[in-house]
């Protein structure tokens, strides 16, 4: 039986990022053979990947890439903010967005099937993802991407790694970059009021109607006369129009000059925005709220066989 030294364990940990005890066990099982120990860990790490797959990934990063008139924006999620700063994870995300630009995959499944080799993992994006899950110890998920490649000019802006914007435009590059930064700050949902989805408008209408009903109850309780149905309808419609102005890009007040709308700024710069995409990390994902005390109590109970 080979002697397992601290240096051997340290070297294996440096290569795999596996826990120290797992590295020592693998080296012992492999009788000191580093290559065999690494393979044994890969099997264990692969099992770890399947266990992690059900865990919520509400953290992560947004990344972008542009090559000529082709560009892409991608969101890849992990479980914790700590892992979102991991160099291996960040390199994987950038490799993925570069592949989107180069190969134009139809969806996440198609992207996952593309060739990729990283850190001895591969030969596909999916294989690398699973390998990194085992290495890092968290679930990782490619959530979404958007590719632009119709020949227009592209401006992109990343606010840290949590907000990313891609703008398709013709005209002035500086104005387009300013618009990308504006979008990250003000978060419009469409170019114009006419582009806002009917579902979103109906949700806002329901909110406005609910507010009107609450006001009517308060007026009644105070002994004040109720507003006519016509006035209530006008109030609701006014709320809708205000909402549409607030969420449509061209109608928003330009963040760098409150004397102009975005539309006015673009016109003065001779620039046309054809479309945009904005990703915010974890947007719409319900993040699990852990009750630490309850979790510890459950573990203690399990240990006692209760």
UniProtKB/Swiss-Prot annotation:
<comment type="similarity">
    <text>Belongs to the EF-Ts family.</text>
</comment>
<comment type="function">
    <text>Associates with the EF-Tu.GDP complex and induces the exchange of GDP to GTP. It remains bound to the aminoacyl-tRNA.EF-Tu.GTP complex up to the GTP hydrolysis stage on the ribosome.</text>
</comment>
<dbReference type="GO" id="GO:0005737">
    <property type="term" value="C:cytoplasm"/>
</dbReference>
<dbReference type="InterPro" id="IPR036402">
    <property type="entry name" value="EF-Ts_dimer_sf"/>
</dbReference>
<dbReference type="Pfam" id="PF00889">
    <property type="entry name" value="EF_TS"/>
</dbReference>
<dbReference type="InterPro" id="IPR009060">
    <property type="entry name" value="UBA-like_sf"/>
</dbReference>
<dbReference type="InterPro" id="IPR018101">
    <property type="entry name" value="Transl_elong_Ts_CS"/>
</dbReference>
<protein>
    <recommendedName>
        <fullName>Elongation factor Ts</fullName>
    </recommendedName>
</protein>
<keyword id="KW-0963">Cytoplasm</keyword>
<feature type="region of interest" description="Involved in Mg(2+) ion dislocation from EF-Tu">
    <location>
        <begin position="80"/>
        <end position="83"/>
    </location>
</feature>
<dbReference type="GO" id="GO:0003746">
    <property type="term" value="F:translation elongation factor activity"/>
</dbReference>
<keyword id="KW-0648">Protein biosynthesis</keyword>
<dbReference type="InterPro" id="IPR001816">
    <property type="entry name" value="Transl_elong_EFTs/EF1B"/>
</dbReference>
<dbReference type="InterPro" id="IPR014039">
    <property type="entry name" value="Transl_elong_EFTs/EF1B_dimer"/>
</dbReference>
<keyword id="KW-0251">Elongation factor</keyword>
């Amino acid at each position: 039986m080979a002697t397992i030294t601290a240096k051997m364990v340290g070297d294996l940990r440096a290569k795999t990022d596996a826990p120290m005890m797992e590295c020592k066990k693998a080296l012992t099982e492999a009788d000191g053979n580093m290559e065999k120990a690494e393979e044994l860990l890969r099997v264990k790490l692969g099992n770890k990947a399947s266990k992690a797959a059900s865990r919520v990934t509400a953290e992560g990063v947004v990344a972008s890439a542009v090559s000529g008139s082709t560009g892409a924006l991608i969101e890849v999620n992990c479980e914790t903010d700590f892992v979102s700063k991991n160099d291996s994870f960040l390199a994987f995300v950038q490799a993925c967005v570069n592949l989107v630009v180069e190969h134009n995959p139809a969806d996440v499944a198609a992207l996952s099937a593309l060739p990729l080799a990283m850190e001895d993992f591969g030969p596909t994006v999916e294989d690398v993802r699973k390998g990194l899950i085992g290495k890092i110890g968290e679930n990782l998920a490619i959530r979404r991407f958007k590719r632009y490649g119709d020949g227009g000019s592209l401006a992109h802006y990343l606010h840290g790694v949590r907000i990313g914007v891609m703008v398709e435009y013709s005209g002035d590059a500086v104005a387009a970059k300013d618009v990308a930064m504006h979008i990250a700050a003000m978060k419009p949902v469409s170019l114009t009021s006419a582009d806002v989805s009917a579902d979103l408008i109906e949700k806002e209408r329901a909110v406005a109607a609910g507010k009107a009903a609450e006001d009517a109850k308060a007026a009644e309780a105070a002994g004040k006369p109720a507003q006519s149905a016509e006035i209530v309808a006008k109030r609701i419609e006014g709320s809708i129009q205000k909402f549409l102005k607030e969420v449509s890009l061209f109608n928003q007040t330009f963040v760098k000059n409150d004397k102009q709308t975005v539309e006015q700024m673009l016109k003065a710069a001779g620039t046309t925005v054809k479309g945009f995409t904005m990703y915010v990390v974890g947007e719409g994902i319900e993040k699990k709220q852990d009750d630490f005390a309850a979790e510890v109590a459950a573990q203690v109970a399990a240990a006692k066989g209760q």
